[in-house]
UniProtKB/Swiss-Prot annotation:
Protein name: Succinyl-diaminopimelate desuccinylase
Keyword Methyltransferase carried by entry: no
HAMAP family for the chain: DapE
Co-factor requirement: Zn(2+); Co(2+)
Assigned protein family: Belongs to the peptidase M20A family. DapE subfamily.
Catalytic activity: N-succinyl-(2S,6S)-2,6-diaminopimelate + H2O = (2S,6S)-2,6-diaminopimelate + succinate
Cofactor binding summary note: Binds 2 Zn(2+) or Co(2+) ions per subunit.
A biological process from GO: lysine biosynthetic process via diaminopimelate
Active site residues per record: 75, 140 (proton acceptor)
Gene: dapE
Amino acid sequence: MTATDPVANLQTLIRCPSVTPAEGGALSALDAMLAPLGFTVDKVKASEAGTADIENLYARLGKDGPHLMFAGHTDVVPVGDEADWTHPPFAAEISKGELFGRGAVDMKGGIACFIAAVARHIEKNGPPKGSISFLITGDEEGPAINGTIKLLRWAAERGERWDACLVGEPTNPDRLGDMIKIGRRGSLSGKITVHGVQGHAAYPHLADNPVRGMLQLTQALMDPPFDGGTDDFQPSNLEVTTVDVGNPATNVIPAKASASFNIRFNDSWTAETLRAEILRRLDAAAGDGRLRPGREPVKYDIVWADRPSHVFLTRNNALIASLSSAVEGVIGRSPKLSTTGGTSDARFIKDYCPVVEFGLVGQTMHMVDERVAVSDLETLTAIYETFIAHWFANAGA
């Protein structure tokens, strides 16, 4: 096998059953691809009490700047019922021009293509005038506690510094070249508990149904909208994701009700200002007696998730221009610069260097029969190879 072939690279990676938190042999496979190209490869185990140990990988080619990082993850989500798959999820079979397997799109395909692009660049031009590194985690689809955030810290403590980063997530909605992610909205989660008084459903005057209070509070969180969006970001949106009373009986008024929520927020807010606005809405709704005539204000408490994700926007013109021109040069159209969608590990990388995201088409990620067109693997490799040349030319200018 030669590392210049993205299809062979991807088949090797898919055949490693690396469902989070299992490494499945994927990092060893990467080591075998990168070391012959001249990369120095380190495997880094990260641990934290109450979580699974995670194997990560950091590889670097070159010692000088400018320094370009490629970041990604080899862990994948569970396959579900294997009987539902047309082709076995870890067999990496090709059928009718498509390569099937868990991780084909998200995101072993992006890693396979960038390795092939680096190998082709070296084959044609020799090592780049600077450094290229791979920062690969096995904990992106999981809690993301022992993955990219700790690997970045480990590398930085050893003197690693980066000038730019490309994350190979599947950013394209419909066709390869549709979209480059240049930022992400923030994410904040919390859990509200409303306290009532348990009682018999036939004697509501002797109880206090917390569901009524919860309706008031959740409605206040979702309406009115938090904002109308900004020049770079879509409107912030809050969604109630769970509601629970822990009560299997139909004739008992529950003692408490809980609801979890998540808000994806734009650059109109910080996590701190958003918490303040949410508490303002909850306090106002708790004192509104229209749904609870004659009752005291709703008694509630709120617990915030430990680690909010902060909104960010990359404005590094050289990085964005190098990638945009590579896409346009290979496929003939300009990609949209976007901040839509969920979060990714770019939220950690932005604290170290400018970061953008570009990879395959994401239509089948996490689905049964996840697959990628073989032609897209070749095209993405060509885009990545062109990007590498453009970025080093611009960074060294």
